[in-house]
Amino acid sequence: MSSLVTPINLDKINHSQSTVKDYILLMKPRVMSLVIFTGFVGIWLAPYSVHPFIAGIAVVCIALGAGSAGAINMWYDRDIDSLMKRTQKRPIVRGAIEPDEALSFGLITGFFAVFFMALCVNLLASFLLLFTIFYYICIYTIWLKRRSIQNIVIGGVSGALPPVIGYAAVSNTISLESIILFLIIFIWTPPHSWALALFCNDDYKNCKVPMMPAVKGNLYTKKQILIYSILLFIVSLMPFFIGMNNFIYLITSGILGLVFLYYSGSLFYDTPDNKQAKRFFAYSIFYLFFIFLLLSSTSTISLIS
C-alpha cells in the first residue's frame, strides 16, 4: 500500500541556527563510516611500509572527500529529498543549513581533502580522490541518478574507489589487489541499493527517480539482485586465489557469501511489508564490513609498519 508523503516547500522553511551536528549530518556520516573503513583496509593491505602519520592523513583526506561529495549531493538533491520520507530530516530540507552554505562547505572541504592528499601523501592518491568526488557529483548525482535505471550500477564506481585510494596512498600504484577490493564493493552496491529501493519504492516513485523497482517492477529487480549476488560470491573468493588472503578468509567469506545468496533468494518469497528486503539490506551492510575486516585480518601480505 502506498504511503502519502507530504512534500516540504523549501521556500517556506524557517531556517534555524546551524550546529556542528548538522554539518556532520550533511556529510552523510553513515556512508562516510563505510568509506573510511574500506579506505583504511586499502592502506592496511598495501605491501609497503608507511608512517602511521601519513596513513592517518590519508584516512582523514578520504573521509573529508566523502563528506564533501555527500554535502554537494544533498545540496543538489534538496528538491527530491523534500519529497522522500526517509530524507525529509536532512539538514538542508529542515532548514538547519542554507543551500548556499552547504555547497560552499562541500567545495571547500573537497578542495582541502584533495590538496592535502597531494601535499602530504602522493599525487596518484590525490587524483583518485578528486576523480571519486567528481564522479559521485557529476556522473552519478547530476547525470545518472534522475535519468537512468542503471544509476546505481554505473554510479557505483565512486563508492568502490576508497580502498583503491587507500592502497595508492601507500604504494603509489594501482594493483590487482586493489582492483579486487574495488570489484567487491562495485558488485555489492547494486543488490544493496536495490534492496533499499524495494522497501522505499513509493518514495522513489514520488520523486520520479528511476530506481529499478519503480521502472521494471519488483520481480525483475529481485532477479537482478540474485545475479549480482552470485557474481559477488565469486569475486569475494578471489583474494584467496591470488594469494592475497589465507584459507580462513576463503572459508569465512564463502559462508558469508552463501548467507548473502540465501537472503537474496528469500526476496522472491517476501511479504507485502518487505520484511525480507529490509533483512537483506541490513545483512548486506554487515556483510561488507565483515568481508573487509576479514581482508585485513587474514592478509598474507605486508601490513603497516
Swiss-Prot record:
Keywords, ordered alphabetically: Cell inner membrane, Cell membrane, Heme biosynthesis, Membrane, Transferase, Transmembrane, Transmembrane helix
Positions in coiled-coil regions: none
Pathway noted in the entry: Porphyrin-containing compound metabolism; heme O biosynthesis; heme O from protoheme: step 1/1
Main location: membrane
Enzyme class: transferase
Membrane spanning stretches: 31-51, 52-72, 102-119, 123-145, 151-171, 179-199, 225-245, 247-267, 284-304
Membrane topology category: Multi-pass membrane protein
Gene3D superfamilies: UbiA prenyltransferase
Gene Ontology BP term (one): heme O biosynthetic process
Compartments, record wording: Cell inner membrane
InterPro entries registered for this protein in UniProt: Protohaem_IX_farnesylTrfase, UbiA_prenyltransferase, UbiA_prenylTrfase_CS, UbiA_sf
Gene Ontology terms for molecular function: protoheme IX farnesyltransferase activity
Keyword Electron transport included in the entry's annotation: no
Enzyme Commission designation: 2.5.1.141
NCBIfam families, per database record: cyoE_ctaB (TIGR01473), PRK04375.1-2 (NF003349)
Role noted for this protein: Converts heme B (protoheme IX) to heme O by substitution of the vinyl group on carbon 2 of heme B porphyrin ring with a hydroxyethyl farnesyl side group.
Extra information: Carbon 2 of the heme B porphyrin ring is defined according to the Fischer nomenclature.
Protein name (record): Protoheme IX farnesyltransferase
